[in-house]
């Protein structure tokens, strides 16, 4: 199954919520009032002149499909419900987009753009979905950029994110994909206080044939990063991917830990890290925006990866992230398998999101 097919199939919670919401927005329209029928004026009465009998008006035949359509088993499709795009409908649309975690500011901008040139017109759900998909594509296209690869070796990729965001799995999947593309990769298991994270990376490394450097439990992550840089340089690795801690309970300690990792690896390469990826969990909804703000203060975030889009009805948060921060979205994840993480495509995502 292609990634696009998986995206359409597994983004059902978000697309069903938004698609059903758009149908409801159209369906909420009051039925148009029929214009009042003027009563016919009575015919003048002429004394002594008999009136001819009123001819019977034949009852109109019910609409039926043509002979060819009936022979082929085709029925006439019912007309799609339509609603006049007015202020009340725009308010319903805004409420629906906010409920889908698109955020208030983004929802207001999107609805304003949809209204342009359409106010006062009667539109159906299909046109509304296409208009929304076009707006989402317009917002997302500038940020849909794959992880850049540089001739510099090793290219150091620092990966940050809160615990449970899918950070460790994302590193394993990216490393496996780069390895399959012919790149030589080294992984550093820098979250030295979480044995489970280290073990998970080792499993991914074994699957992909990628070496994973580990250190004793609770040891200095910066020291491990330095050793990993040394090994990556010696082996001519194309990429060094460094996992980091994701404990936000004590931000001061985490900030110092990340800053120390950067200081140490810059002793080996003053331009490192070349990428700092923030991995976000789509199921957190609007909390993802606060995570971006936090990690931009802790580290120089250069791009985003969004995971778990298959397990949430909050896919709209990705639109809010793009609209607010403009950070590149390198990849999205829709499952646990290695090929369930792929480069982000704005148009495919937009159409899957609205159910087209």
Which role fits each region the language model picked out?
Residues 1-139, 145, 152-153, 180, ...:
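Non-catalytic terminal/linker segments enriched in charged/polar, low-complexity residues
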Residues 105-108, 133-356:
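P-loop/Walker A NTP-binding module and the surrounding RecA-like catalytic core of P-loop NTPases
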């Amino acid at each position: 199954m292609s990634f696009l097919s998986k995206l359409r199939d597994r983004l059902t919670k978000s697309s069903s919520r938004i698609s059903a919401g758009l149908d409801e927005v159209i369906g909420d329209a009051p039925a148009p009032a029929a214009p009042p029928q003027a009563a016919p004026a009575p015919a003048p009465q002429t004394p002594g002149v008999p009136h001819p009998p009123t001819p019977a008006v034949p009852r109109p035949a019910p609409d039926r499909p043509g002979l060819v359509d009936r022979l082929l088993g085709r029925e006439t499709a019912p007309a799609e419900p339509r609603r006049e795009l007015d202020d009340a409908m725009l308010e319903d649309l805004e409420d629906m987009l906010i409920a889908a975690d698109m955020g208030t500011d983004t929802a207001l901008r999107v609805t304003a753009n949809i209204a342009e040139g359409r106010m006062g017109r009667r539109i159906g759900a299909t046109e509304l979905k296409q208009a929304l998909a076009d707006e989402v594509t317009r917002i997302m296209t500038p940020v849909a950029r794959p992880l850049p690869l540089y001739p510099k070796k090793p290219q150091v990729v620092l990966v940050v994110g809160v615990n449970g965001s899918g950070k460790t799995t994302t590193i394993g999947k990216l490393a496996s994909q780069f390895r399959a593309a012919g790149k030589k990769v080294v992984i550093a298991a820098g979250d030295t206080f979480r044995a489970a994270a280290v073990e998970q990376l080792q499993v991914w490394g074994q699957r992909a044939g990628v070496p994973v450097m580990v250190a004793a439990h609770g040891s200095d992550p910066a020291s491990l990063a330095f050793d990993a840089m040394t090994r990556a340089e010696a082996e001519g690795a194309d990429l060094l991917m460094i996992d980091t801690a994701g404990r936000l309970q004590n931000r001061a300690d985490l900030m110092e830990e990340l800053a120390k990792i950067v200081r140490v690896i810059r002793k080996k390469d003053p331009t490192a890290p070349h990428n700092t990826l923030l991995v976000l969990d789509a199921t957190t909804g609007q909390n993802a925006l606060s995570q971006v703000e936090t990690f931009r203060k802790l580290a120089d975030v250069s791009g985003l990866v969004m995971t778990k889009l298959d397990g949430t009805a909050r896919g709209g948060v990705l639109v809010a992230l793009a609209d607010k921060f403009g950070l590149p979205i390198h990849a999205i994840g829709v499952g646990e398998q290695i090929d369930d993480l792929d480069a982000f495509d704005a148009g495919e995502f937009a159409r899957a999101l609205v159910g087209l």
